[in-house]
Amino acid sequence: MDLFSEESPINEIGNMDMTDQQTQLCSSSFSHFLKHPKVQHFISTYSELVKMPTIRYVYFYYLFKKIGGFIGNEKIGTYFSKNVCNNIAAKGVPKLADVYKACEKMNLRQQSEICLLIEEVTRGQYLNSLWDALRDGTISSSKFYWATKKQNSTKKIFEPWPIKNDYYVAGPLAFGLRCEEVIKTVLNELICTPKQASCFDCGFMQSPLDGIFGVSLDYCTNVETNKDNLLVFHPDTEVYEIKSRFKYLFDKSECDTLYKKYKELYSNPCVKTLIKFIFSVSKPAIEFVPSGRLPSESDYLLAYDEEWNLRPTKKRKLNASHEMIKKCIEYNSYAGSQIYILSDPAENNGQITVKSKFKAGIFMNPRHTYFYQVALQHRVVQSYIGLSESPKSLGTQKNFIVSSFFRKRHFSDPPVCYVGKKQLEKTVEIPVFIIITPVYIPRSALLETISQAVNFWEESAKEAFTEYPWAPCALFANGDLTP
């Protein structure tokens, strides 16, 4: 499908089946746009350096003017016509130079509003037909870690990663997708009830400031939806990244070692019984690391307290080359995590509630890829907060990672179970407890990793395209997370 053709998508792909139509939409990516002969010619001949994020908004203009009617959402194309390209002739396909000049004059508010419209149109994430196309050419939270480490090949940035939803039903990926929805309900119904409006289904959030980064959020609070169905991020937005621990899934059977340890935790909820449960698998989800020592990258939760030192291993000392890691540990190590033990529906008339809660000295591992994932979410959400129409002026964004643990269904479970007032689907496992860990990102560490990732993005662009857009360091040099 040619974004520069006047041919209607209905004529181009309307007669295809749904799968082929989705393939065509996915192929309308930023990479394919940049490779188009018209775009390559424009970049090579334009009187100035073609730069980010302007060229990304040019891409959005041509994409949504082309497909808006076909996908049943013309809001983005209409916004461009009324607010950005209002001096460009309505008939025909406008010249690249004219659209680029118009997009170059956009202010931060307009950029933010376009990104919010894109978030709306991409809700549904991996089930959304535009998801792969719009993730292409961006460093998403799942790519941020290896982008800072300059790992993997350029195709990971500039070719779509098709998200296949035909995962093996008993495998960890399908398990994670199922359980994510359950934990959103647990958070919404049992944990975050005093908070303001929550967002369950967040689309793709392109960073409005640079056009290079993008994230999607599992669950957040203190975020509202306005009359136009667009998200409004308040200064005290809380973002929750959900991880479901497949290796701890157990049967409600005396033959299952995990179940025996869980029973101890359930009857006597405390740090001691939690440690016994966590260490009942060969590779525990929480790593003990003594003060002043370097953690491994094997898992994303750490503990300082000696009671976690059940399997002593030698650790390297933190040295001058680990300054960023040291600072991140200092920011996180004393925060602690909140553990919520959930009631067994078989003992509680089908109701899953918070049976008990306690605090433990568990914190985020700054060497793990999930720390980078949360860091980028923080950065992008902060830019939306800064550009938000929120009536609030006070508050600070908070970020959390939620570790969730489940058991398999048992014949003793009631046929219908509830989390708060919400019915639990009969096909999902039973949640037994969650660990909520706050994540703090030092500003200096965030700026350093952002700079590294941008450099990698530009290197990747040089390798992927003959003519490529420029990523000005002015976008990042001052470290402004809000305009």
Swiss-Prot record:
Q: What is this protein called?
A: Shutoff alkaline exonuclease
- GO-annotated molecular function: DNA binding; endonuclease activity; exonuclease activity
Please give an example of a GO cellular component term from this record: host cell cytoplasm
- Which family does the similarity line name? Belongs to the herpesviridae alkaline nuclease family.
Where does the record place it?
Host nucleus; Host cytoplasm
One Pfam assignment: Viral_alk_exo
Per UniProt, subunit arrangement is: Forms a complex with the DNA polymerase, the DNA polymerase processivity factor, and the major DNA binding protein.
The record's annotation in InterPro entries points to: Herpes_alk_exo, Restrct_endonuc-II-like, Viral_alk_exo
Give the organism, scientific name: Saimiriine herpesvirus 2 (strain 11)
- Kindly report, in one word, the top-level EC class recorded for this enzyme: hydrolase
